[in-house]
UniProtKB/Swiss-Prot annotation:
The gene is rplR. GO terms for biological process: translation. One of its GO terms (molecular function) is structural constituent of ribosome. The keyword rRNA-binding applies. This is Large ribosomal subunit protein uL18. Belongs to the universal ribosomal protein uL18 family. This is one of the proteins that bind and probably mediate the attachment of the 5S RNA into the large ribosomal subunit, where it forms part of the central protuberance. SUPFAM superfamilies: Translational machinery components. Pfam families: Ribosomal_L18p. One of its GO terms (cellular component) is cytosolic large ribosomal subunit.
Length: 120
């Protein structure tokens, strides 16, 4: 079993619990170069809000250096996804770390989203 399969297997129980709660899900994906955050509908069929280090606004705030793979960039993405969610009328979400450890970039994104007003 490789790392990706292990991570996806770790994510299954969390996603099952979130599906039972019937709340919006803040899903995080972390690659070596970028971080992505999506808020998914309770039914799980639509992405309502998204933000990533690929967005022009985030890249401009980072200084154009293209450094999307650090905790500072993750915090900007967390703040941005929270702002977009509040504009869409979403305040309560369940945090889906997608099998990634709650450490480093994933933690920075979550804490920034909380500080910007998302509740989870």
């Amino acid at each position: 079993m490789d790392k990706k399969v292990s991570r996806l297997r770790r994510a299954v129980p969390t996603r099952r619990k979130i599906a039972q709660l019937r709340v919006h899900r803040l899903s995080v994906f972390r690659s070596n170069l970028h971080i992505y955050a999506n808020i998914i509908s309770p039914e799980g069929d639509r992405v309502l809000v998204s933000a990533s280090t690929l967005e022009a606004e985030v890249r401009a705030q980072l200084g154009g250096a293209g450094k999307g793979g650090n905790a500072t960039a993750a915090a900007l993405v967390g703040k941005r996804v929270a702002e977009k969610a509040k504009a869409a009328g979403i305040e309560l979400v369940a945090f889906d770390r997608s099998g990634f450890r709650y450490h480093g970039r994933v933690k920075a994104l979550a804490e920034a989203a909380r500080e910007a007003g998302l509740k989870f």
